[in-house]
């Protein structure tokens, strides 16, 4: 039997953070996807409509790498009402040479959170104005704070706004983000006003109806 390493979320948090290395790693993955014969099948998605949930299974193989991962990522969007996170999951790492399981990453969605935020940082680095100062985030969950942090890694963000339908949630997120980043962060439930002065806008909600209108965005 192979020696299978099991890493918990606590283990992973000790060695992986949302930093410039994470952004560079995700950018390198995008470059590989565009320039190499990457094998990436369509996402397998299972909808659990009864509980406002879905499960996504994702994988890819980059030629030349010794391993590949398969990610199982449930998203149950009523979970916050139960005091649970909306997203969790795990990843299994396999040998590219033998197909043998080498590691189980019990990250509870942490690696997905980091990867998603880092991708936002990559996008902002290539698309946002160099002099962008004010960021607006639509959403007030974990990803909202992480996206804002990612923006601060690629631009000199001096202020930010958190929008949410629930003002208390927006205020809680804004307070936590401000303490983490040392940047003034305000909260609002006015989506139009939130967009008015934004240099960068990021949406981080699972909303199925629009929360941002095109005519709100300044040129």
Can you say where each PLM-predicted feature lies in the sequence?
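Conserved acidic residues
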Residues: 133, 158, 199
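Cofactor-binding loop segments of dinucleotide-utilizing enzymes, especially the Rossmann-like FAD-
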Residues: 106, 140, 165
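NAD(P)-binding Rossmann-fold cofactor-contacting core
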Residues: 153-181
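Rossmann-like adenosine-cofactor binding region
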Residues: 182-219
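Short amphipathic alpha-helical segments
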Residues: 148-149, 174-175, 213-217
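N-terminal ligand-binding/catalytic initiation module
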Residues: 1-113, 119-121, 128-131
